[in-house]
């Protein structure tokens, strides 16, 4: 399988399973937890994937697809955690090497087609491929050849540089092999991130298989990033208010009567607590006492923010409804109390932040999407995405 998101893969999933969720249900009965690990673990020992992973028999393509989507399902449990990042890096490199070996992009997700023999005017081709330059080696000449064309509308979604660098004719951009491959790599990263965000919404429905696989990936990821001195992402850390999603920022300003309980007790309480204490929950039904040892973080960093936001409401929530503080603790998983202890953690459910569609339905005034909201299904995913992008930005600045 050259591309797990490509045309052949999509056709296979549709014909054999109907949809992606049905495929994910089938995976645990088709492969062991250990099998997908091989697609990632090579990163601990080498810069390049071993040849036995690059050369896959066509008869094994369904099993190969099972392995990739097993990793994707496990990564979706923590879409901006270390596990997802190491899976993305490993599989991107692996499938890129397979495409290089095949010298073919036609079956990938990239909407390119080979360039016809006389499609580009002769004079233009002489300039683009430097055909008159006799100093070029055969390898250099091959690199300069125009191989593919892509519709401009598809190019714009992936191209990060000036269009002055691109030869455009009749609504198509014409690409050399290396440029086309780099665009496929960008497309793979985007599709991977979108897929784990979509699956994140269904993570509680995933079989236990994926949670066990995530634990193994976590071990590999921690070793991989520790050796390279890279930033750990998605771990408990002080709140970054500047990276909060628009709906949370709106709730922090205070809201009118009718929205107060939902905005403060339901949305803010769940979002702030998970964002600060456990942004990437390791399991279903996690409790606060599974993540911290005392109530100091809640009492000093989370509760004051919730109370301040409640006091900005009109009328002020906690002056108008003093008992609502018990509901705050209830939503944090301590039961209906106003003076909890750590032992009370687990007396009720620690509510997870509501998904975006529920926020739109219950408090549409809070929903004011920005450019980072695209593809996001939950406000916590938004925050993790912003933290992730911020970390990547700092890594880039450090390496310069």
Curated annotation (Swiss-Prot):
Cofactor note: Binds 1 [4Fe-4S] cluster.
Gene Ontology, cellular component aspect: primosome complex
Residues bound to [4Fe-4S] cluster: 247, 356, 367, 373
Sequence intervals crossing the membrane: none
Cofactor: [4Fe-4S] cluster
GO BP field: DNA replication, synthesis of primer
GO molecular function, one term: DNA-directed RNA polymerase activity
InterPro entries, A to Z: DNA_primase_lsu_euk/arc, DNA_primase_lsu_PriL
Keywords: 4Fe-4S, DNA replication, Iron, Iron-sulfur, Metal-binding, Primosome
ATP-binding is among the record's keywords: no
Pfam families with a match to the protein in the record: DNA_primase_lrg
Coiled coil location: none
SUPFAM superfamilies the UniProt entry points to: PriB N-terminal domain-like
Assembly: Heterodimer of a small subunit (PriS) and a large subunit (PriL).
Function of the protein: Regulatory subunit of DNA primase, an RNA polymerase that catalyzes the synthesis of short RNA molecules used as primers for DNA polymerase during DNA replication. Stabilizes and modulates the activity of the small subunit, increasing the rate of DNA synthesis, and conferring RNA synthesis capability. The DNA polymerase activity may enable DNA primase to also catalyze primer extension after primer synthesis. May also play a role in DNA repair.
Family classification: Belongs to the eukaryotic-type primase large subunit family.
The protein, known as: DNA primase large subunit PriL
Annotated organism of origin: Thermococcus kodakarensis (strain ATCC BAA-918 / JCM 12380 / KOD1) (Pyrococcus kodakaraensis (strain KOD1))
